[in-house]
């Protein structure tokens, strides 16, 4: 198993810091990345941090993460629409945590359904950038012991 954790971000997360700050906060994606790098390093892990507005990129990156510690995935709106992301997680068996900056259950009803939740280890939402920290920590501290 690789000592790498993948943090993958979906559509519109490149707009963090300017997009609806009342919902998503003032932190930019670069701020989130810095927080993730610090957290991964505290657990002795390398970090791959990526963002794309394109579903196929996310599928490719999930597949490439097979054999790693896992994936922390904020799929954005694809959470509620993407069978392809669901199938990539299920098909690779990569340990994954679904994260969201906002509490999706306190928002519009269409955000309450996730195609990803049934195939990930856990879901963390509503803690802003700390959702990522919690996701990284969860994967780092629950991974199988190395032989």
Swiss-Prot record:
Top-level taxon in the UniProt lineage: Bacteria
Residues at the active site: 24 (proton acceptor), 100 (proton donor)
PROSITE patterns: DEHYDROQUINASE_II
Single GO MF descriptor: 3-dehydroquinate dehydratase activity
Its EC number(s): 4.2.1.10
Reaction(s) catalysed by this chain's protein: 3-dehydroquinate = 3-dehydroshikimate + H2O
Record-listed substrate binding positions: 74, 80, 87, 101-102, 111
Presence of keyword rRNA-binding: no
Pfam families, alphabetized: DHquinase_II
InterPro entries in alphabetical order: DHquinase_II, DHquinase_II_CS, DHquinase_II_sf
Function of the protein: Catalyzes a trans-dehydration via an enolate intermediate.
Quaternary context: Homododecamer.
Family the UniProt entry places it in: Belongs to the type-II 3-dehydroquinase family.
Protein name according to UniProt: 3-dehydroquinate dehydratase
Organism of derivation: Azorhizobium caulinodans (strain ATCC 43989 / DSM 5975 / JCM 20966 / LMG 6465 / NBRC 14845 / NCIMB 13405 / ORS 571)
């Amino acid at each position: 198993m690789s000592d790498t954790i993948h943090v993958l971000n979906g559509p519109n997360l490149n707009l963090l810091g300017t997009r609806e700050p009342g919902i998503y906060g003032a932190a930019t994606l670069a701020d989130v990345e810095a927080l993730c790098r610090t957290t991964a390093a505290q657990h002795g892990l390398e970090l791959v941090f990526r963002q794309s507005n394109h579903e196929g990129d996310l599928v490719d990156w999930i597949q490439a993460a097979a054999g790693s510690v896992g994936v922390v995935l904020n799929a954005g709106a694809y959470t509620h629409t993407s069978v392809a992301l669901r199938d990539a997680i299920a098909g690779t068996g990569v340990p994954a945590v679904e994260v969201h900056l906002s509490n999706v259950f306190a928002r519009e009803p269409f955000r309450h359904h996730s195609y990803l939740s049934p195939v990930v280890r856990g879901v963390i939402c509503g803690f802003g950038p700390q959702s990522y920290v919690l996701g990284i920590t969860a994967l780092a501290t629950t991974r199988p012991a190395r032989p």
